[in-house]
A protein has these predicted regions:
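Alpha-helical interface subdomain recognition
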Residues: 1-87, 91, 97, 109-114, ...
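Short glycine/proline-enriched turns and hinge-like loops at secondary-structure junctions
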Residues: 72-73, 141-144, 168-172
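A short, Trp-centered hydrophobic/proline-enriched beta-strand micro-motif
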Residues: 125-134
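Hydrophobic, small-residue-rich alpha-helical packing segments that form membrane-like cores
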Residues: 138-142, 157
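Glycine-rich phosphate/pyrophosphate-binding beta-alpha loops
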Residues: 139, 164-170, 359-366
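Flexible, small-/acidic-enriched active-site or ligand-binding loops
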Residues: 145, 193-221
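A short core secondary-structure module
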Residues: 147, 155-156, 160-198
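A short, charged helix-loop
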Residues: 211-238
Length: 387
């Protein structure tokens, strides 16, 4: 048996290069023109970027091709996301939204009606969405923490409760809300135009603020239930695997770009008569970053490959998200130190990445929760408490 090696397929390499050129030639110049105080790309500029991205086939990257998306597998997506995140406003969405927002992956379990009412408009019309799991009572343990309720009332459900730390809710067209029913946790599609739904921003350290979502007896059609009652946590597990993989890939892309900035700086700056690139302490920082980035990349690729082959990738996705977000934050911190005062300046994206990656270590599974999850998987029954 001949080992075929680790080279990416030519088509995937070409796609990665295409995304990289779009970021360098289209996206970064748009961001640079906004000035250091900007926190997002204005809607009119974003519309132009979206049109150009769509003409290149870079639209709703992981949405199935049969519905009009790019149809990327999990592996293809994480490879591409590395390049798609090498710019200033790469959170909460790679490309600052230039590539559209794919429908929540759970919707594909909802049947033909949900496909027509929500999936196709998301891709065709550029609708945006949110996913609401976390609540004030907790986010890492949804089976116990979710207190939002959904009561059946004839052909409708009535949802009541509060969700916290929700991305996109203030400007989305709809969202997937997880609520407690008689059969357990269930997933519902809630349009933001429904009476009784309101949002408010929660200021945090990064530029993009999450929101609090209040559901005050919000009535939705029973047809907006995704799957069956009680299937919500199973549906959320698939969403979390994909979400954790994308966080890992984005952290790797940012870390790699931060190292590129450091290498460029070290090659042109001198202290006490010698280039920074000759300083052993700084050399070791770059060496450690290069090793960690490569390790994180392979960890993420393995997890994505496992997900694509239909295997349970929850453990590997947790490992990838934990390792890559931690290393991404550490690498950006080190590069800021290498650049000194310039590392803090808003003229370059390091300080924004620093804040974004600090948040990334908390959302979609805190680093501590992921370590506990990994430990339980590795230790097996020995990890369970005994009386």
């Amino acid at each position: 048996m001949t080992f075929s090696g680790f080279d990416l397929p030519d088509e995937l390499s070409a796609l990665r290069d295409l995304v990289g050129r779009f970021v360098r030639e289209q996206l970064r110049p748009t961001e640079d023109a906004l000035g250091p105080e900007a926190i997002a790309i204005p809607p009119e500029a974003l519309a132009g970027l979206r049109q150009r991205a769509r003409s290149l086939g870079l639209w709703c990257l992981d949405a199935p091709a049969e519905y009009g998306g790019a149809g990327l597998t999990a592996f293809e997506l994480v490879v591409v996301l590395e390049e798609a995140c090498k710019h200033r406003f790469c959170f909460p969405h790679a490309g600052a939204g230039s590539f559209g927002q794919s429908p929540p992956v759970v919707l594909y379990q909802g049947g033909a009606d949900i496909i027509e009412r929500f999936v196709r408009p998301t891709i065709d019309l550029g609708w945006t969405s949110f996913t609401a799991i976390a609540e004030e009572s907790g986010g890492s343990d949804p089976a116990r923490a979710i207190r939002t309720t959904a009561k059946r009332d004839g052909d409708h459900y009535v949802l009541s409760g509060r969700k916290m730390w929700i991305t996109n809710a203030e400007r989305a067209d709809y969202g997937v809300v997880y609520a407690r029913t008689d059969a357990g946790i269930s997933a519902f599609i809630v349009e933001t135009s429904r009476p009784g739904l309101s949002t408010s921003r929660i200021p945090v350290i990064r530029n993009h603020a999450p929101t609090e979502l209040v559901l005050d007896d919000v009535r939705i059609p029973a047809a907006n239930l995704v799957g069956q009652e009680g299937q919500g946590l199973a549906l959320a597990a698939n969403w979390l695997v994909r979400g954790r993989l994308t966080y890992a890939a984005r952290a790797i892309g940012i870390a790699a770009e931060a190292v590129r900035l450091a290498v460029q700086w070290m090659g042109t700056r001198s202290t006490f008569g010698a280039p920074l690139a000759t300083r052993q302490g700084l050399q070791w920082s770059i060496a450690d970053a290069a090793v960690e980035i490569n390790a994180g990349r392979w960890l993420t690729w393995q997890a994505a490959w496992k997900a694509d082959t239909g295997q349970d990738a929850r453990l590997e996705a947790a490992m990838a998200k934990l390792y890559c977000t931690e290393l991404g934050f550490r690498v950006v911190d080190d590069v800021m130190q290498i650049l000194g005062a310039m590392g803090m300046a808003r003229e370059i994206p390091l300080e924004g990445w620093f804040r974004d990656l600090r948040v990334a270590r908390v959302v979609e599974g805190t680093s501590e929760m992921l370590r506990s999850q990994i430990a339980r998987q590795v230790l097996g029954p020995a990890a369970k408490a005994r009386n």
